């Protein structure tokens, strides 16, 4: 972040630097500040493709699932990648669409992608399907880790949407 701050001081009207700062802020769990930077980046002419997926994450962290999903859809139409698919699937699950979320994950699940399987368990837990989530965790994780994560998973459906996004993305 120090490097980016210096870059911003040297080139305060560089949209790409603002976009990078926005991405850094979202990963530092400061989504409101991230959205400010993304807005500045856009005003300065930075291409949205530089930050769509991270802006979607910032919006998810603020409980703005509809806006987040629009960002993810656009990001996926420009440059599909597994991480953005997982973010989009989680956002759908938070919005109460667990089956649609799992449908998006299906190619990764068939490829035995561990991140996708963990996310599938979270999707189910967010939607109150704790027995199914527990089965997945027990089948895909070492026993000690599974036992540590199950109590956490079974609380996900009690959180608000912003908290669910934060819990899933940052633990």
Could you describe each region identified by the protein language model?
Residues 3, 20-21, 54, 87-88, ...:
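Canonical tetratricopeptide repeat
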Residues 10, 27-28, 44, 61-62, ...:
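Register position in tetratricopeptide repeats
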Residues 17-18, 51, 84-85, 116:
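TPR alpha-solenoid repeat register
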Residues 24, 58, 91-92, 123-124:
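Residue-level signature for tetratricopeptide repeat
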Residues 76-80, 98, 107-116, 122-148:
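TPR/TPR-like (Sel1-like) alpha-helical repeat modules
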């Amino acid at each position: 972040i120090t490097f980016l701050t210096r870059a911003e001081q040297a080139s305060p009207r560089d949209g790409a630097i603002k976009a990078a700062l926005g991405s850094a802020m979202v990963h530092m769990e400061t989504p409101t500040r991230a959205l400010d930077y993304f807005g500045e980046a856009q005003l300065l002419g930075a291409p949205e493709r530089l930050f769509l997926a991270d802006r979607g994450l910032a919006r998810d962290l603020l409980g703005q699932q509809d806006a987040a999903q629009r960002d993810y859809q656009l990001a996926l139409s420009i440059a599909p990648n597994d991480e953005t698919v997982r973010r989009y699937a989680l956002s759908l699950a938070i919005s109460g669409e667990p089956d649609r979320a799992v449908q998006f994950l299906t190619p990764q699940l068939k490829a035995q992608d561990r991140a996708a399987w963990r996310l599938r368990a979270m999707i189910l837990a967010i939607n109150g399907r704790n027995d199914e989530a527990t089965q997945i965790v027990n089948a895909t994780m070492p026993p000690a880790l599974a036992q540590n994560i199950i109590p956490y998973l079974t609380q996900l459906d009690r959180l608000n949407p912003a908290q669910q996004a934060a819990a899933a993305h940052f633990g």
